[in-house]
Each structure stands twice: as structure tokens, then as C-alpha cells.
């Protein structure tokens, strides 16, 4: 039997242009290849977990429009349960405009659209799915009151909660105290703890601060250097594989979705 992961988060239609260099303020550059596809942190993480083999249910909100229908179709093709993807009659499906340079770096602007209307009532409607999951994976592209409702529901039912605190924003301890595992990047870790990353000792201090918040395990992503894994019994850097980047869009999302699947199978955060 597959282990179950519920992802609560965003779905966006990504519109991507590839170009030699990212434009600066007031600058126009000529792009090349253009494509559209599914995206959003929640959707990316759900797909990553499903492709690894987890049974995934995705809770989200899309517009009652063509882009929303296409998104649900894409997710169904990935064998993701879309029963709790709600259609919104007020706002359109979220859209992300992405520019990618020839080094694989990107700049992104997001119009949240229907993602902004995901409500605690939506979360309550999906409570049976959440309570029966092994893992709840959530990000911060949804309204904070819905993030709280999801995390609290999972915690109250003994479900392991993984929070990917992106996009970076300050969070109160009334949310963090219900989180089991947190997966920030350096910017997010610094914002949530007030500790500047300078070396391994500062990473250890950040992990200890998260422990003070009540979080059990910490995964701090370090870009090309890998990630720093912090548990109560061990802390260490897990190095990244040396690969040539093509497009870094969604890389952090895939990283968060993958551990959700592996942890649901009983692996630990120190497993490379």
C-alpha cells in the first residue's frame, strides 16, 4: 500500500520565456523559446511526491476557466487525487510569468488569482483526507489562515506536518509549534529565526532556534552546496550532486516534495 501525502497549496499556469540574460529595471530584452505549463509551489511539490511513488491528494483552488480545467487535467495525468481542487467563480487561475537566462537562473512574477481564495472552509471540507494522511506538506502561497487550519487539522490527528516556508515571510509561533519538519532556504531560515547564516555554527544555531519553536527536524537548503540536516541527535551537511543547471524553476519545490514522499516511507532527513 502506498503511503499518503496531502499537499495543500497553490496551482499556477507558468508562462516561461527563455532569454540570454535577465532584463534589468527599464530594460527590454529579446527572448527565445516560449512555453506554458502547470506550476505553483503546491502543484510542483505534489507532482514530485507522486512521481516518486506516494499516493497524493492535492488541496487547492483554481479559476472556473480554461487554465483551471487544463491544470486539473495535468494533475490527473500525474495520478494525483484532484477531488479537493475547488473551482472559483470570482478569481481566475493563478499565473506565473517566468524569465529564464542561459545559465538557468530565473525571475518570476506571480498573479495569485484563485489561490488567494483558498479558505479554512475549503480545508475543513478536505479534513477526512488530511486526517488519514501520513504527511501533510504545505507552503505559504495560500492565505495564512488556511495554512493554519491545515496544519492544526493535521497536528490534531497525528499527521506529520512538513512546512516549506516559501515565499519568505514572518510567522507566529502559533503556526510553527504545530510543525514537525521545516524546509527553509537560507533567506527563509534567517527571516524566521533572526540569525544570519555565516558558517556551520550559525546553521546549528538556526536549527536550535527551530527546536525552541517546537519543530523536530530541520532541512535548510543551501543551493549548489546541498542541504543542512538538523535533528535532535545529529546535524550535518548533505552535499548536492554536481550537475549542470538547465532551469532552476521549481527546483526547491521538487526538493520539498521528494522528502515528503520518502519520509512517508519511514526514511529520515539524514538519508542522502
Where are the regions a protein language model picked out?
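Conserved beta-alpha-beta core of the PfkB/ribokinase-like small-molecule kinase fold
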Residues: 135-205, 224-227
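Short beta-strand scaffold segments in enzyme catalytic cores
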Residues: 47, 95-99, 226-230
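A glycine-rich helix N-cap at a beta->alpha junction
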Residues: 78-90
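Conserved phosphate-binding/catalytic loop of the ribokinase/pfkB sugar-kinase fold
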Residues: 87-88, 98-135, 140
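Anion (oxyanion) recognition and catalysis
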Residues: 50, 76, 155-156, 211
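Glycine-rich phosphate/adenosyl-contacting loop at the front of the ribokinase-like
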Residues: 1-62, 66-80, 245-246
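Conserved phosphate-binding/catalytic region of the ribokinase-like
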Residues: 2-5, 169-174, 200-272
